C-alpha cells in the first residue's frame, strides 16, 4: 500500500513542481515505467533463488522512502530528477517479486487468487488514499509535501518490516518455505507469450489511467485537480472491489479456466470506455471510473494467477515478472509517450478510444488462452 502511495504521488505532484508540457512530462513517466518493468523482471529471477521475501520487501520500502524524499531536492535539476526517478523505479521493482514469492510459498493453488486479490486490494487502497488526501495536502502546504510525507511513511514501514523479518528468521521462520533452486534457462511457452501480449494491452490501459486520468479529466470536464483526483480515487475504489471479488470468484467458479473470466472482463472494459468517450458529466465519469477500475484490476489479479499456474515451479517469480515486464514496457511506450502525443494532437477524448482498442486486442489473447484451457479439460475428461 505504501509503495503505491509513493508511486501515485508522482503523476499528482510532479506536474506542479516542474513547468513543462504533456509530451515532456510523458518522457519522465516513460522512463519510470520502463525501468520499473526491467527491475521487476530482474528481481523476479533473483527472488526465485532467494528465501527472504520479507527482508527484501522491507529493503525495497526503505530505499523507496529515501528516494521519494529525495525528489524534493532534485526537481530543480531535470537531469538529477530523471536519475532519481529511475532509481526509484528500480527499487520499487523489487516489491512485487518479493510479494509473489511470499504468496506462492504460503498459499495453496485453490486459494491463491483470493490471496492475490487481497494483496492487490492493498495497493489500490494506497492509491485511493493518495488520490483523496494528497491534493488536500498540496493545497494546504505545497507539492513537495506530497513526496515528503509518502516517503517518510515508506521509510518507517521498511524499517519495521526488516526488523520483523529478522526476528522471524531468528525463530527459523524461513524453514517454512519450500524453495527450489532457480534455473537460469527460462522456458517460455506459447501460452506465456499470449499472456504477455494480453498483459501488454491491459497495462497500457492501467498505467494510462494512472498517469493521465487526473490531468485529462480536469481538462475534459473543466474541473479542478481535486475533483479529477477524486474521480480517479473512485476508479481505485472500483479496483479494490474488483481485486477482492475477482479473486474469490476465480477460486470458486473459474479455477479451471481463469482466462474465460479475463475475456469477459476485457469485454466489459471495452464497453465502459466506449460509453465514457461520449460522457461529458461528472456522474457518468464516476460510474465509468468505478467500472473500469473493477474490470482492469480484476484482470491484473487474473494475469498474475494465470502466470503462476502455467509457469514452471522453479521459475514462478521470473514468469510472473516477465508478464510485468511486458506490461511496463507497454506503459512506458504507449501509456506515457504515445498517449501524451495523441492527446496533444487529437484531444482528450482519444484516450478512451485508444483504451477500447487495447481492450479488444487483450480480449482476443485471453480468448485463445481460454480455448487452450478448454481443450485441456476435454482431454482430461
Name these PLM-found stretches.
Residues 85-123:
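Cytoplasmic helix-loop-helix junction between adjacent transmembrane helices
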Residues 313-345:
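A late C-terminal transmembrane helix in Major Facilitator Superfamily
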